[in-house]
A protein has these predicted regions:
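Alpha-helix N-cap/helix-start motif
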Residues: 72, 102-103, 135, 139, ...
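Structural microenvironment flanking redox-active thiols in thiol-disulfide oxidoreductases
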Residues: 87-115, 120-147
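Extracytoplasmic thiol/disulfide redox context detector
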Residues: 2-101, 216-233
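C-terminal cap of thioredoxin/glutaredoxin-like
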Residues: 3-5, 148-233
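Solvent-exposed loop/turn segments at secondary-structure junctions
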Residues: 67-71, 98-102, 129-136, 162-165, ...
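Extracytoplasmic/secreted envelope proteins and their assembly/folding machinery
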Residues: 76-83, 106-110, 123, 139, ...
Length: 233
């Protein structure tokens, strides 16, 4: 009798464990699957091959723009404001768009301004100049813009036609065609993996919300030790 009672008790305990496990499974199945706020192919594109970023310890955010693009000028105050609250583990960079021959001189202007470390206002002046005439390729008019910031025409001409500037333009063109697969501006590439554009239900302000989402996605994929340098900014 004692042996039978012991066997029944063990059976009861086994049944209790089994029932508890079944309840856990049923409960888990009843929970709805979390739906991502932003979806690849709809709100952003996944690049076919990841692109090497400059700083391995940072999440890179790369803006693609063109001075002849009115939408890029509209996006400018948004991206500038976003930069001010950018987390410490994020690195921001820009690359001028180069798809056509007429865009090469405009890309060179960006690299001249970068080399001279000119204030942000020069970019606004270049937007204003080139949005009015997208095919403009007048070195004297370009130099006149830089003269407002104390750059002599001689210094401008030297940098504008320099081997270094030409090399950067060539590199930007190759990168956009073969790596970023960019076809419009403004666009933002997050950590060399995701390309974000406006349109199709994504506004310019919405672009930055998608960018923030992708930053979190990349941050969550980093090793735990790297997270201590996370969004402290």
């Amino acid at each position: 009798m004692t042996l039978l009672l012991s066997s029944l008790q063990r059976l009861a305990r086994s049944l209790a464990v089994l029932m508890a496990a079944c309840l856990v499974v049923v409960g888990a199945q009843a929970q709805p699957m979390a739906i991502p706020k932003y979806i690849a192919g709809e709100h952003y594109q996944v690049l076919p091959e990841p692109i090497k970023v400059v700083a391995d310890d940072k999440i890179e955010v790369m803006e693609i723009f063109w001075y002849g693009c009115g939408h890029c000028k509209d996006f400018e105050p948004l991206i500038v404001a976003w930069q001010k609250s950018m987390p410490d583990d994020v690195a921001f960079a820009r690359t001028p768009a180069v798809w056509r021959k007429q865009m090469r001189p405009h890309a060179a202007l960006y690299y001249v301004a970068e080399a001279l470390d000119l204030p942000h206002e020069v970019h606004i002046d270049l937007f204003n100049l080139l949005i009015k005439n997208r095919s403009l390729n007048d070195q004297k008019k370009f130099a006149a813009v830089f003269a407002r910031y104390g750059v002599s025409s001689e210094d401008f001409d030297k940098l504008y036609k320099s081997f270094g500037t030409t090399s950067k333009v060539n590199k930007a063109e190759k990168r956009l065609r073969k790596n970023y697969l960019s076809q419009g501006t403004p666009e933002v590439v997050v950590n060399g993996k995701y390309r974000v554009s406006s349109g199709k239900g994504v506004s310019q302000a919405g672009m930055l919300e998608v960018v923030n989402f992708l930053i979190e996605l990349e941050r969550s994929a980093k090793p735990v030790a790297a997270l201590s340098a996370g969004a402290a900014g």
